[in-house]
């Protein structure tokens, strides 16, 4: 069994960013009840509603456990039936193929809780908690250190896996530990060092473990009004520099130091370039937006075109930050 934490190609998309899932199950819808839980596995669940691009086909099987026991039962079911597992958070850094995904998709969106330790300034948060909501809650307490994250449209689990960041800060800077679940049901607590963090990456990517919760170290004791105002400034900065009026996945490409991917794309004359319903955003060139009616393959082909143009002009192959799941067909 292989587990992909979410967050195909020919030619230009690096293989490390592609998980090939050939979804060719029976079209008959069914529900499988997991013994000893209030959890059910559904077949042929459309994933477009669960991704920020609002595109993508169906999951062969889909489950959204509400507690660790149900999550363990879901992994056990996948292991017993030799199913590939894909973990889905907010779907904000994910491109799902129009053909869908085979195996079992486990959504963590119902794993929700947080515990604040007001003496130490630490907060322990479940994998399904929203990063922006957490940022506002922390700000209202007057705790410093999470203001930068208010504009990241994802969940705690996904942020831990990809080492999400903004404004020269990232998850690795404040993470104390992450609790992860293995397919055999064992739970480990790992430090940032054990997670092997790098720029937008960790050892959890492509591994067979699922993040269940994370503990962050913040700095309490500040004026809540001040921290809230700072958080609002970060949010406003995102709103004025990034497109929020159309569905997107956030930044599409990693920044190839010392350049910014957005600058390279803009200097290549690609702002506004469109394939089908997918367009390079006018406001920020490292965003691809769904202008309406886009297919996942439109977005994939636009990613490929951007890579080709930038490589021809700058001899730099942009590496996607977005995770692509399923089979795609290049134009």
Curated annotation (Swiss-Prot):
The lineage of its organism: Bacteria, Bacillati, Cyanobacteriota, Cyanophyceae, Nostocales. It comes from Trichormus variabilis (strain ATCC 29413 / PCC 7937). This is UDP-N-acetylenolpyruvoylglucosamine reductase. Its cofactor is FAD. Its EC number is 1.3.1.98. GO terms for molecular function: FAD binding; UDP-N-acetylmuramate dehydrogenase activity. It is an enzyme of class 1 (oxidoreductase). It catalyses: UDP-N-acetyl-alpha-D-muramate + NADP(+) = UDP-N-acetyl-3-O-(1-carboxyvinyl)-alpha-D-glucosamine + NADPH + H(+). NCBIfam families: murB, PRK13905.1.
């Amino acid at each position: 069994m292989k587990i992909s934490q979410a967050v195909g190609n020919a030619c230009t998309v690096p293989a490390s960013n592609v998980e090939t899932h050939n979804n060719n199950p029976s079209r008959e819808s069914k529900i499988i009840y997991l013994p000893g839980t209030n959890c059910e596995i559904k077949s042929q669940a459309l994933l477009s509603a669960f991704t920020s691009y609002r595109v993508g086909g169906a999951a062969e099987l889909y489950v959204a456990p509400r507690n660790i026991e149900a999550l363990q039962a879901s992994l056990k079911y996948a292991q017993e039936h030799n199913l590939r597992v894909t973990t889905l958070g907010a779907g904000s850094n994910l491109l799902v193929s129009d053909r869908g995904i085979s195996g079992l998709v486990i959504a963590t969106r119902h794993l929700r809780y947080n515990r604040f330790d007001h003496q130490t300034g630490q907060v322990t948060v479940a994998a399904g908690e929203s990063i922006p909501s957490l940022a506002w809650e922390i700000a209202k307490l007057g705790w410093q250190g999470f203001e930068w994250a208010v504009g990241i449209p994802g969940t705690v689990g996904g942020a831990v896996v990809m080492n999400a960041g903004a404004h020269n800060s990232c998850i690795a800077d404040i993470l104390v530990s992450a609790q992860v679940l293995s397919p055999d049901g064992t739970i480990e607590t790992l430090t940032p060092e054990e997670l092997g963090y790098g720029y937008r990456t960790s050892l959890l990517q492509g591994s067979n473990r699922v993040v269940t919760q994370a503990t962050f170290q913040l700095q309490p004791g500040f004026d809540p009004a001040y921290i809230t105002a700072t958080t609002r400034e970060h949010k406003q900065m995102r709103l004025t520099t990034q497109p929020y009026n159309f569905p997107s996945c956030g930044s599409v490409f990693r920044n190839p130091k010392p350049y910014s991917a957005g600058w390279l794309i803009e200097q290549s004359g690609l702002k506004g370039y469109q394939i089908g319903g997918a367009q390079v955003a006018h406001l920020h060139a490292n965003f691809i937006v769904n202008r309406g009616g886009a297919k996942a393959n439109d977005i994939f082909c636009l990613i490929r075109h951007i890579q080709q143009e930038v490589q021809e002009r700058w001899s730099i192959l942009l590496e996607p930050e977005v995770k692509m799941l399923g089979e795609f067909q290049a134009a």
